[in-house]
Amino acid sequence: MEIVKSKNDLFRIIDHADQKHTSKILLFMILGTIFLDAYDITILGTMTDQLTKQFHLSPTMLSVVMTSLPIGALFGAILGGSLAHKFGRKRILSVSLLILVITSLGASLAPNLFILLTCRFIMGFAIGMDSPVAFTFIAEISNKWQKGRNVNYWQVVWYVAIVVSALVVIAFFVMGTGEHLWRFAVGFGAFIALVLYILRIKYLKESPTWIINHHSLEEATEYVRNNYDVNLKLEGNGTSFSENKSSKPSTTELFKPKYLKRIVLATSISTLQGMQYYGVGLYIPIIATYIISKDKLGVLLGTAIVNIAGIIGAYVGSQLTYKVGTRCLTMIGFSLVLIAMVMTGVFYHSLPMIINTFFIALFLFGHSGGPGTQGKTIAALSFPTYLRSQATGFVESVSRTGSIIGTFVFPIILAAVGLTNTMLILAIVPLVGLIITTALRWEAVGKNVEDE
């Protein structure tokens, strides 16, 4: 029997809980939220040729279309953390899914460019709210030994979603959807969102740490007793630091000396990884036309196959998080990405297709196992519960500027200077990331931030 005298005792109990009690929630959280976000964000990357043709887009206007979602995500991320702190994680996650159902359908049926841009912007807003809350939720339902690994699983699911999105497009392509291919593919996201919304409403429970912070000690104890299958005996009046901090914290607390290095490191990694991924990884289908094939089916198959490297890298990174640490994995990842981009930029014209494809795969492997995962993980693991949603929301919102820049500049630079020079120009991003991560020494894994 566990004795509960304060909310600190409840935090200790869930921090040491058997992982089997959270596996179902993790399944819905990771395989649901992250999968859908990745699908919606990347699906248009396979359709740039059709979008350009149907809406008569210049390289700049293509950049505007592709950037509309990340811009919406920036605004959503600004609000997501605060709303999740006030109303709970589950409500925000459910509302965002409902918005994605409506806007995915709207985008797929868009009769003109204005409607498409509007729907994609609102989709981005929902994803921006959804993503930081998802990472917070995963960290809060995982025990102390598995937080890093479980949070990092999001990147595995991200690349699974990219591969699946390419296969979905191939399926619709084979069905003969013709010029409406992009509409079917975008609309399919509404179906995924609807299924997840129904499952989430039926099965998903509120974050235990949010319950502990926002409910009485008696109510929180009952929640933990029922959901973690532990025998608890309540003693004492339940006063603790947790109850005093249940009101909305100020974002300025993130910049106090204790947390400054952590928030700068997490924000820098997340912003730079967003810039390098959205500036290169999002446009793998376009890069594939240079390296793999000019044929539409060949491009889609190549996109699906090369992104398997992302799945492998993300899985390896998640398994090594506790052993190697988030910072070391980030430095390794930035190094691999830098090598891949420089080699492609310098030797693209003189190397065979298989070697050039390998370097693109190396880019995805290094990114997914390193900075692509670790920035958000550091944000989720480096702060106590009362600050966590604020931290993940702040990191997510600032990092969206990197996503916006990367998404916007690639088509323009590519049209102006070609693939090799584009890769060399963008290689400065992982170089800067490597320098910053080397300079800022903070390791989030294994730290008990609740007791600081």
Predicted region positions:
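Transmembrane-helix signature of 12-pass secondary carriers
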Residues: 1-452
